Amino acid sequence: MALWVIEADGKVKRFQEILKKAGIRGAEVFATGGHLFSAPRSLHPLGIDRNYQDVRTPVRPDRVEQLTSLASLADHLIVATDPDDEGDVIAADVARLVQKIRPDLPISRIRLQALSPAALTSALERKGPVGEGVAGTVRRVFDRWIGGTFSRSQGVPVGRVFSAFLSVVSATPLPLGRVVIRYPAVDGPPFFATVPLLAGKKDEWSARIRAFDSLLPVSPATVELRPRPAPFSFGDALLDLRRNAGMSVVEGARRIQSLYERGVLSYPRTDSRGLSPESAEDLLSLAKKAGLTGFDPARLPPLDPLSPHEALHPLGESIRISDRGDQTVVERISRRALYAGLPPFPVEIPAAESLPEWARSLGLFRPLHRLGPDREPMASAGILTDAPDAVVLQGLMAAGLGRPSTLPFHVGKILAQNVLDSDGRLTAKGRVYRDKTPGAISDPGLTAAMEGILKAMGQNGEGVKKTMEALLETLPGEIREQMETVLEDPLAPPETEIERNHAPSGIGLEWG
């Protein structure tokens, strides 16, 4: 029996279907339900030793028991957890757990970019060994280490992403929404522009919008070709759904994940806005059905060779969607992906000298062609204020903080701390948190340095210890010394019942 291990329970039925379509019979599909092991909720005791191993306990002991029971009967284990760093951590945990009872069992790792037969076939062609999940492990251990060290010593919540966000907002208040401008034209529709709504500017823009009808109309001076917007990343899609469909960041993330698990959308937790040539070609039939005769797969932005995931896009599976909210998600993601393959659209630009000085830098334009299925819709003039979760999401994305898989979590955490006021500035509480956090920890550059080190060390095949040592070298000596004082002496993994008699319920601790 071949045992296939995936993450989400909601994927099991769909995964069984694509195995059958791919001609794979006699397979058992098991879902971990997410992470098998997790660190304690409390940061104290820290539970990290001087080899950078962290103590974790089973999240759901019943899943651990089921997995080991199934593995004892398998002749091959294929780990198909999500194709991201967290999926790699789960894959490493699965392999480590199974190898304790079946050291001779062949174990393979595949990385599916979508839940479809074609994606499965492609992933099987590139299958390989299970790695150590270094990147995900380093982030988990380092973030817990930072929080456990400085939250207690400083008496305020401290975190790599949270504290950096406070630093960013302190320097530059967050945009609160958008201002849509419709500037009068001599003939035909007005010219458009969209600019960020900054703190303290709402009354000024309200007055300007009310005065638009009294402005001297302008004529088009030149015609330019504008490229179509790129397909959505995960964060792009969450922001779009919040603004245009009224879905909270959490709801949007839940719906996108569900549609992925049903085989409707590609892998969701991506920061890419490009597609592979194969995926671009797959969109051609959908474009024809939508009447987009100008669609050309070659126009879609190419996938960055270093990016593990593609932009969000529909898979074209004929799956009935009855829920109106889910329909909206699919429609907006599909439209963005398909329109990215259309020809650049011509726009008319007014002469700068005919505009008042304040309007010359707005980027005013109007579409030359305003009919047809490929037209770009223009919003009505006005001030569009974003919901608080959209404000925070956009701020995180602009600062490069948080990974796609953690964006909803960080948005919720920041809002729960009440560190922002209605103008997108830090509250008194937020300023206290900022002032008590060491500058080296609240520096947004720490995240950029971490990601660069993870990429470089990963390409060299380095493990957790060397990667962590390289990361620590980016911190000032006094910060490193303070962090090192809270580490525990290296301890061997405790002997467990699973090592004696294959009884998973006896696991006490798991050292990652």
Task: List where the protein language model places each region.
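Basic, low-complexity terminal or inter-domain segments flanking catalytic cores
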Residues: 1-7, 16-21, 68-71, 75, ...
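Short amphipathic beta-strand/extended segments with alternating polar/hydrophobic composition
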Residues: 111, 188-201, 359-363
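Intrinsically disordered, low-complexity regulatory segments
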Residues: 1-136, 140, 144, 389, ...
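C-terminal or mid-to-C-terminal helical accessory/interaction module adjacent to the motor/catalytic core
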Residues: 110-192, 218-225
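Structured, charged N-terminal subsegments at the starts of enzyme catalytic cores
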Residues: 227, 232, 236-245
